Every structure is written in structure tokens, then in C-alpha cells.
Amino acid sequence: MKEEKQLDLVIIGAGPAGLTAAIYAIRAKLNTLVLENELVGGQIRETYTVENFPGFNVISGADLADKMEEHAASIGVNIDQFSNIEKIKLSDDEKIIETEDVIYKVKALIIATGAKSRRLPIPEEEKLHGKVIHYCELCDGALYQGKDLVVVGGGNSAVEAAIFLTKYARNITIVHQFDYLQAQKYSQDELFKHKNVKIIWDSEIRNIVGENEIEKIVVENVKTKQKTELKADGVFVYIGYEPKTELFKDSININKWGYIETDENMETNIKGVFAAGDVRSKLIRQLTTAVSDGTVAALMAEKYIGGK
């Protein structure tokens, strides 16, 4: 039989939003637990360098995540890492989170589950994922020393990944569905300094032929419908993110893209249930906005609990 625990607050997710919320909650003397089924730090761990977070001119994403985790631990934040949630029941009157070992009955909940990389929409993605299709340049870039790579996407993540991969790859081809890059101008300028990078505009990958190695990559121009073939050793994909909201879709208002809808206080349609960070429906998703969301969510959770 599973153990039952009563808590003031559970925070699901230990990225920047979740850790910030936890720091504020502990300082407010709330009996708080953070549940995280992956590495503490979230997407920031996969970021090569962070240059727009106040207090650090340049810092690696992993180092910043470590500093956030250390800060949280230093004031007593309790993180149950690699904990999987099996069931969740949310209403105005009760909030129950069930993991493999424990049933938590809580007064308030903050959802900070973040988002995951959107998969390359081709038939071969599943069988080639982790072999020649990758989503993390920091994790897998070193495998391609002196080889040819394709990077898919044109936003900040794609451009910054391409810049990072130039230290390993012989040549890099960016395949982008538009005729312009959406990345920040600073990153674009850095990219264009590298002579071994070229861009195929208005195009998408349709197929990758091969079993354990790439034989050819079929690329289609989205305007002319003309197909061409590329040769490469690996493909790194950065075509946006999908929110991790599967657990909550039956109880919380979620928009058509899967993001949780909240008011300006981070509260969802259920009283006492808040959302923060990239999982929330909003215009801008940045490290600094995630931290801001976590702050507001924790303060409003404290106010909600105090009013019960």
C-alpha cells in the first residue's frame, strides 16, 4: 500500500521556473516538494552558453543549472528526482498527485514541466533517433568530428547549435522552411562568420534513407515542390518545442497547441493550481521569463494557501 503524505505545495518540474518557485516557497515556510522525472535544470542544461541572464556575462547552461540547483539545496528545497507521476486528480476542492511510491495530498500545485523538442516529422525518425538523428548538440556533437552535418531549423536554438557544431563538423548545411532566419541578429552574425556553413532556404526534410547510417537525405522545396538529395553523416533537429502537458489535459484548460492557459497570476482554471515557465501559454519563452513566472506562481500559491 502506498504511503500518503500531506503537503502545502508540490511543484512538478525542476527547471528554472520550478526551482525559482521552490526557493520562494521555502522562504515562505511552505511545506514543499519538487517532483522531477529527469535531470534538474530542464532545457537549460542543453544550452551551450547563456549570455542574457543578469549577473553572468557568459555562463554555460549546465553551470547555470548547477548554480540554481545548489542555491535551492542550500535553503532546504527537497527534490524527488527521477520520480514518475502515475495519476493526478485536480479540482478546486482537492489536489492529489500519485507517484510510484507515494500519494501526495496538497493544498496547492505549481506545474512547471516545461517543453520537449519537437520530433522531425518523417517516417524514419523513430528508428534513426539516437543513431543519426539528434536533438542535443552538447550531448552528441563530439561524435561527428570531421564529418558533415545537417541542422534543421532557423530559430535561436538551431543557429546556436550550428555555431557550436562548427568546432567538430567539416561542413554544416542548415535546412530551413522559410527564406529568413528567426534567430537573434547577434547569433546570425556569429553564424555567418563560419565559411563551412551553408543554408538551404524554403525547404524541409521529407525522408532519410538508411538503417544505421545515412545513405541520403531527401529535401523538398516547400514553394516549388522540387526534391533534392543531400549527403551527411548526422542530422540535428531544432524545430520548436511541445509542452509536457499530457498529465493535465483532462483537468486543466489547455490551448490548441497544448500549452496551459493561466491568468496573470499564473493560476489555471482550477483554484490553487498554477503553471509557470515554458509549459504556460504566453508570447515569450525565455530563461528570464521562466524565472519570473516561477516567482509569481509561488507568491500566489502562498497567498492561496494562506487564505484557505
Curated annotation (Swiss-Prot):
PROSITE patterns: PYRIDINE_REDOX_2. Belongs to the class-II pyridine nucleotide-disulfide oxidoreductase family. InterPro entries: FAD/NAD-bd_sf (IPR036188), FAD/NAD-binding_dom (IPR023753), Ferredoxin-NADP_redctase_2 (IPR050097), Pyr_nucl-diS_OxRdtase_2_AS (IPR008255), Thioredox_Rdtase (IPR005982). This is 34.2 kDa protein in rubredoxin operon. Pfam families: Pyr_redox_2. Keywords: Disulfide bond, FAD, Flavoprotein, NAD, NADP, Oxidoreductase, Redox-active center. It comes from the Bacteria. It comes from Clostridium pasteurianum. The lineage of its organism: Bacteria, Bacillati, Bacillota, Clostridia, Eubacteriales. Its EC number is 1.8.1.-. Disulfide bonds join C136-C139. Coiled coil: none annotated. FAD binds at T268, N269, I270, K271, G272, V273, F274, A275, A276, G277, D278. It is an enzyme of class 1 (oxidoreductase). One of its GO terms (molecular function) is thioredoxin-disulfide reductase (NADPH) activity. GO terms for biological process: removal of superoxide radicals.
